[in-house]
Regions:
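An edge-strand/N-cap motif at the start of beta-rich repeat modules
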Residues: 27-93
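C-terminal motif of bacterial Sec signal peptides marking the signal peptidase cleavage site
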Residues: 14-17
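Sec-dependent signal peptide recognition
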Residues: 2-8
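Residue-level signature of beta-propeller blades and closely related beta-rich strand-turn architectures
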Residues: 67-68, 132-134, 182, 237-239, ...
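Repeated scaffold domains used in trafficking and secretory/extracellular systems
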Residues: 47-57, 104-120, 161-173, 209-227, ...
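Bacterial signal peptide processing site
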Residues: 19-21
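Residue position within the beta-strands of beta-propeller blades
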Residues: 62-64, 72-73, 127-130, 177-179, ...
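Surface-exposed loop/turn elements that mediate protein-protein interactions on large endomembrane-trafficking
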Residues: 38-46, 77-104, 137-158, 188-210, ...
Length: 459
């Protein structure tokens, strides 16, 4: 099962598919950026107009950071730049319109000098969450690239020790909204930062989080959906033995900053096929109602998974409704354990199905399979396109986005050798696998085509 980790760890993995490691050139927060991050003493208002949920996808464009070696397959990392990918054509160009810019310094709006950069598109504007780390400190910083792609502004620098919950970011016509986990993982605070002046306002602090112990902690509230001036959040509550699990929903009203507890979605006790004993036997349980927070794609919300009947649905927690996505998926049964993962896009849904072979004691047999299905209008189509990843055997292609009838995916792999430097300055070489990205018509993908148009990078 895919588990959502705290963003401090997830940034280095595949949370939004737009993080990218860059050279370790950690800057020090300046007095100006620290002052910009200071909270307002007396917040007068909390934004205006309708909220918009942000992801890397926006209006037919997908924003992602690429190093030079991912583009040219060279043996040195080179620059790291933020690119805007046109999903219709496959054209990818730096998010910079400065005349004559060589895109080779921090003067370029598209320059990525953080260790990790996550991108959030809002029309032509781009918000950046940068994570800086070295041996001495680590911290996050919010920045914004203007709609004309000529200016880049620091909005807020986060104090070391706090973690940004990177899945679930929203804006309105005044503010950017995000939340922070304290270092002790017991408190989470929802903040608003003025996108024009960098002034911060604290909206609400949750004090009901677990203490960060156990496999499924730290607990955190994830932003699921926005509507008007309301933000809907949910946190997963789960015991360390993983037998009890629920999603607790709440709503934050930005007209007055109030919070309202909402419904609680609890997983059923399930059909126990094998009762674990903590030693030789492992639990094998088929659940009828299991819930997951969507952590990938361009839609937020909850997935409802029925491992007994093979059904997957989408829960709109804001209005407490369930919409079927598709059915007929493999089920958890004697000898097999199944898990489903749901991602939402503008053009449909992607369901991952992981099947794990289990023996009579519930332990793994090593017979594992992973399939992915694209679903729209209640009809599912298995995506059989695959790629060979050296060292990892054959893998499914990786879908990043599906909007306006087009799909952006990592559809192949390139292998090479790169140079790196140890902390003591010693140069060494190591093998490297690069994803090859391309676009394709959704209808062609569903028909089984592998005729992707590779991304065309330009300066």
């Amino acid at each position: 099962m895919k588990k959502y980790l705290a963003i401090a760890a997830a940034l280095a993995l595949t949370l939004t598919a737009c993080g990218q490691a860059a050279a370790d050139s950690t800057p020090t927060p300046t007095a100006a950026t620290e002052a910009a991050a200071a909270p307002a003493e007396q917040p007068q208002s909390i934004g205006s107009d309708a909220l918009r949920l942000l992801t890397a996808a926006a209006d037919g464009v997908y924003y992602q950071v690429f190093n030079d070696w991912e583009i040219n397959y060279t043996d040195t990392m080179g620059r790291a730049l933020i690119y805007a990918i046109d999903e219709q054509t496959g054209d990818a160009r730096p998010v910079c319109n400065l005349p004559g810019c060589a895109h080779d310094s921090a003067a370029c709006p598209a320059w990525s000098d953080g260790n990790v950069t996550l991108c959030y598109g809002d029309g032509d504007e781009v918000y950046l969450l940068l994570f800086y780390y070295n041996d001495e400190t680590s911290y996050y910083r919010w920045e914004r690239i203007s709609a004309d792609h000529t200016q880049r502004t620091v909005l807020a620098t986060i104090e070391p020790g706090q973690s940004v919950v990177g899945r679930g970011v929203a804006v309105d016509d005044v503010n950017l909204y995000y939340s922070l986990l304290d270092e002790d993982n017991r408190h989470q605070t929802l903040w608003a930062v003025d996108t024009a002046g960098g002034q911060m306002q604290r909206i609400y602090t949750w004090d009901d989080l677990a203490d960060g112990t156990g496999e499924y902690c730290p607990e955190m509230y994830m932003l699921l959906e926005v509507s008007g001036r309301q933000m809907t959040f949910a946190k997963m509550v789960q015991t360390n033995d993983a037998l009890t699990k629920a999603m607790q929903v709440c709503a934050v009203n930005l007209t007055d900053g109030s919070i309202t507890p909402r419904q609680r979605y609890e997983r059923d006790t399930g059909n126990v096929l094998v009762q674990g004993d903590g030693m030789e036997k492992r639990n094998l349980i088929s659940y009828r109602n299991d819930y997951h927070i969507l952590t990938e794609g361009s839609r937020g919300g909850l997935a409802n998974c029925n491992y007994q009947s093979g059904e997957v649905g989408f829960v709109d927690a804001a209005v407490d409704t369930l919409t079927p996505v598709a059915d007929g998926f493999p089920t958890t049964r004697d000898g097999w354990e199944c898990y489903y993962s749901l991602s939402g896009f503008a053009d449909g849904w992607l369901v991952w199905v992981d099947e794990y072979g289990r023996d009579e004691d519930g332990n793994g047999t090593g017979e594992n399979t992973t399939r992915q299905y694209f679903c729209r209008d209640g009809v599912k189509t298995e995506l059989t396109q695959q790629r060979y990843v050296p060292g990892k055997d054959v893998r499914n292609i990786r879908i990043l986005d599906a909007q306006q009838g087009r799909v952006l995916a990592a559809y192949d792999t390139k292998t090479g050798t790169v140079h790196d430097v140890d902390k003591d300055g010693t140069t060494y070489t190591q093998p490297m696998n690069w994803d090859i990205y391309g676009v394709i018509a959704l209808d062609d993908l569903l028909a089984g085509s592998t005729d992707f148009t590779p991304l065309a990078f330009s300066d």
